[in-house]
Amino acid sequence: MEIPEVLETLLAGKDLSPSAMRETMRKIMSGGATPAQIGAFLIALRCKGETVEEVAAAAQVLREMATKVPVSAPHLLDTCGTGGDASKTFNISTTAAFVVAAAGGRVAKHGSRSVSGRSGSADVLEAAGINIELTPDQVKTCIETLGVGFLFAQRHHGAMKYAIGPRRELGVRTLFNLLGPLTNPAGAPNQLVGVYTDPWVEGLARVLQQLGSSHVLVVHAEDGLDEISIAAPTHVAELKNGLITNYYVRPEQFGFRRAALSELAIDTVAASLKMMRGVLDNVPGPARDIVALNAGAAIYAADLTDSLEAGIRRAEAVIADGSARAKLEALAALSRQFAAS
């Protein structure tokens, strides 16, 4: 199916078959579509509304074309979210990755520079002294040695270069926001995924179900946050043993006091790093609480505990004893060794 035919199909409000979506994505990712065609495709698809089947098919293509990280670790976890929630909070899921590693997990943290926020995961990790420009084998060594490694999306998804310009110029959320958490180059089967809109909470869980994921928590809070919120109830769709369960969690269930999201807001990468370090230094407050909530959910998703509450308590313990902070410093040191070699 040629791109104009794809556009006509979408403009008529019709869904693409999985095979048509895969064919279209392969054209886009191999330079077979013009920037105008890519932009038109993304907007037409969003206006029609992406289906679970379309998103799963697109993710399959990006997974095929990614530069893989050859990690063989059971329960390998990612904490990459869709972004695009416009909350301007510090890097919560990135901070949580070090907490999960300290709790005994293996984390393949997939991320990039900021698109819609003020500090992307790559931005804050680089500011923390971590070398983000590692080879797949070097990332593998970090994960196997320390329990955590950073997979810089731009290095692993080279084919995305064709969509970067149109995506940036459009300046609105598109299919690619949904694809970020679905295309981990290490193939992490366990995930905590934040999503920018409530209808995609169960939708993304269904996509990951189709893609064969093992244990996943997809979350979106009523205040709009693409994390488990300290300020409002959070919708969770949990994929486990092939089944999806929907429920809500509230911070007070786990002994946390609600706090305004404004207390977690940052306007620079440096401010995000300061807040991250404060959490890992066990400074009390809403930043530490929201990381404990989300890291606890990730620990549970990584099958390190048998309940969300037990995961949260484990997260609090490894923050308090300094082992989570030690993981951040160890990754900075090891990644810089690679840069020097």
Swiss-Prot record:
One of its GO terms (biological process) is L-tryptophan biosynthetic process. Anthranilate 2 binds at residue 167. Binds 2 magnesium ions per monomer. Its cofactor is Mg(2+). It holds the Pfam family Glycos_transf_3. Pathway: Amino-acid biosynthesis; L-tryptophan biosynthesis; L-tryptophan from chorismate: step 2/5. 5-phospho-alpha-D-ribose 1-diphosphate binds at residues 81, 84-85, 89, 91-94, 109-117, 121. Anthranilate 1 binds at residue 81. Mg(2+) 1 binds at residues 93, 227. Keywords: Amino-acid biosynthesis, Aromatic amino acid biosynthesis, Glycosyltransferase, Magnesium, Metal-binding, Transferase, Tryptophan biosynthesis. Its EC number is 2.4.2.18. It catalyses: N-(5-phospho-beta-D-ribosyl)anthranilate + diphosphate = 5-phospho-alpha-D-ribose 1-diphosphate + anthranilate. GO terms for cellular component: cytosol. Belongs to the anthranilate phosphoribosyltransferase family. This is Anthranilate phosphoribosyltransferase. It comes from Methylococcus capsulatus (strain ATCC 33009 / NCIMB 11132 / Bath).
